[in-house]
């Protein structure tokens, strides 16, 4: 689990940095016309990099930082749906699909499993730390 989160974190940091500094190479590689305003791509790079930091935080303290992983899961899932829609409409070339797969889609199943495991561990920790008189809550 921690190794996967470290890999995802490092990948996101590098991907974010490349979106900020080397965006022109990315456009060339994908065969997409570079827009006049680059700011949205660079802001997205900042967010991708911040998720990289977040995945490293989850790896360092999984239960405490588990909600960062939930945000990352939804971010990867929703951005994958939108990107596939753009490929389907022809706005992005089909060559973008392998990039999307390696950047986002491949992480969805393990992130989901890790999220479930961490939620169960957090619930167990909560039960252990709860005083006996508060074992059941009624609204």
What residue spans do the PLM features occupy?
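Non-cytosolic membrane-interface motifs at loop->transmembrane helix junctions
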Residues: 30-39, 67-71, 93-103
């Amino acid at each position: 689990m921690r190794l996967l989160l470290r890999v995802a974190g490092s990948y996101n940091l590098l991907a974010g940095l490349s979106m900020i500094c080397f965006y022109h190479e990315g456009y060339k590689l994908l065969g997409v016309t570079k827009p006049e305003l680059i700011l949205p791509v660079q802001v997205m790079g900042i967010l991708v990099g911040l998720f990289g930091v977040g995945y490293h935080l989850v790896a360092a303290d999984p239960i405490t930082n588990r909600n960062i992983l939930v945000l990352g899961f939804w971010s990867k899932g929703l951005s994958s749906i939108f990107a596939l829609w753009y490929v389907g409409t022809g706005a992005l070339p089909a060559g973008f699909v392998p990039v999307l797969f390696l950047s986002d889609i491949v992480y969805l199943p393990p992130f989901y499993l890790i999220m479930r495991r961490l939620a169960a561990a957090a619930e167990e920790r909560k039960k252990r730390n709860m005083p006996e008189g508060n074992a059941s809550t009624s609204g």
